[in-house]
Curated annotation (Swiss-Prot):
Bilayer-crossing regions: 24-44
Organism, as annotated: Gloeothece citriformis (strain PCC 7424) (Cyanothece sp. (strain PCC 7424))
GO BP, sorted A to Z: photosynthesis
Keywords linked to the UniProt accession: Membrane, Photosynthesis, Photosystem II, Reaction center, Thylakoid, Transmembrane, Transmembrane helix
InterPro entries, per the entry: PSII_PsbK, PSII_PsbK_sf
Record's subunit section: PSII is composed of 1 copy each of membrane proteins PsbA, PsbB, PsbC, PsbD, PsbE, PsbF, PsbH, PsbI, PsbJ, PsbK, PsbL, PsbM, PsbT, PsbX, PsbY, PsbZ, Psb30/Ycf12, peripheral proteins PsbO, CyanoQ (PsbQ), PsbU, PsbV and a large number of cofactors. It forms dimeric complexes.
Gene Ontology CC terms, in alphabetical order: photosystem II reaction center; plasma membrane-derived thylakoid membrane
UniProt lineage: Bacteria, Bacillati, Cyanobacteriota, Cyanophyceae, Oscillatoriophycideae
Family of the protein in this entry: Belongs to the PsbK family.
Protein name: Photosystem II reaction center protein K
Cited Pfam families: PsbK (PF02533)
Its job: One of the components of the core complex of photosystem II (PSII). PSII is a light-driven water:plastoquinone oxidoreductase that uses light energy to abstract electrons from H(2)O, generating O(2) and a proton gradient subsequently used for ATP formation. It consists of a core antenna complex that captures photons, and an electron transfer chain that converts photonic excitation into a charge separation.
UniProt membrane topology term: Single-pass membrane protein
Localization: Cellular thylakoid membrane
HAMAP family: PSII_PsbK
Length: 45
């Protein structure tokens, strides 16, 4: 039962990380964009 109580309190504990969680899914898109820009810079060899 203590574990369930701990699990219930987690969202409050991680409230400060909400902006970070919003940004995390975008990171792979930034890598894709970076790869495209890099290939454009080297001339798509």
């Amino acid at each position: 039962m203590d574990f369930a109580l701990l699990l219930a309190k987690l969202p409050e504990a991680y409230q400060i990380f909400d902006p970070l969680v919003d940004v995390l899914p975008l990171i792979p898109l930034f890598f894709l964009l970076l790869a495209f820009v890099w290939q454009a810079a080297v001339g798509f060899k």
